[in-house]
């Protein structure tokens, strides 16, 4: 995420925190090291803190729906990480579905549209990235997307896919409309990585 527009300072924060931890004599840090229960037992230490991380869901489960979105078999479905890694392979029309309603979907739409992608931004919220209202950035984020030509579709969930189209549904009336889509980027919910 720190490679996205406006988020470069985040990497410095992470680097600083890792540096601070590494300065402690009573802490050993094993980055990017998967551990099994037997590995943990071999370490023979009393206290272990595991930061296992999480992964973005790609099935559409989020705030508005606890059920996966059906009918997406003819559409390329990506996580935010996959979209960033494969930016040159994304097929338009692209839909970013923001049912997390934090900051990432807006930043991702900004990044992809600045790199020439045609983006439709669909969200059940009444504005883009409503959480950014807490940081007084919401209006700036939405204005930037509109200036870049991002099509913003608010107050709509994605009911299902149909071929290379998505059926959206108004959160108030239930009315349905169809939009073309070859690639959907799901910014809906993260699943914790809990396995050892």
Question: Locations of the language-model features?
Answer:
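Short polar/acidic secondary-structure junctions
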Residues: 158-159, 171-173
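Rossmann-like dinucleotide/flavin-binding elements
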Residues: 1, 30-41, 48-133, 172-183, ...
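A conserved short coil-to-beta-strand element within the FAD-binding core of flavoproteins
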Residues: 30-43, 154-165
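Residues that recognize and position ribonucleotide moieties
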Residues: 151, 159, 177-179
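SH3/SH3-like beta-barrel fold
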Residues: 166-170
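Rossmann-like dinucleotide-binding cores of NAD(P)H-dependent redox enzymes
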Residues: 1-28, 100-157
């Amino acid at each position: 995420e720190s490679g996205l527009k406006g988020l470069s300072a985040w990497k410095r924060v992470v680097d600083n925190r890792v540096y601070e931890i590494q300065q402690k004599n009573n802490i050993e840090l094993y980055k990017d090291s998967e551990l099994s229960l037997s590995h943990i037992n071999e370490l023979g230490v009393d206290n272990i803190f595991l930061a296992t991380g999480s992964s973005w869901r790609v099935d559409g489960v989020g705030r508005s729906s606890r059920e996966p979105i059906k009918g997406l078999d003819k559409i390329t479905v990506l996580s935010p990480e996959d979209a960033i890694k494969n930016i040159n392979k994304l097929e338009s029309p692209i839909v970013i579905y923001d049912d997390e309603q934090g900051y990432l979907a807006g930043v991702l739409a900004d990044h992809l549209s600045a790199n020439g992608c045609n983006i439709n931004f669909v969200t059940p919220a009444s504005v883009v990235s409503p959480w950014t209202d807490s940081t007084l950035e919401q209006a700036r984020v939405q204005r930037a997307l509109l200036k870049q030509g991002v099509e913003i579709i608010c107050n709509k969930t994605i009911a299902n896919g149909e071929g290379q189209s998505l059926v959206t549904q108004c959160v108030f009336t239930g009315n349905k409309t169809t939009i073309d889509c070859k690639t959907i980027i799901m910014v809906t919910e993260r699943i914790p990585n809990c396995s050892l």
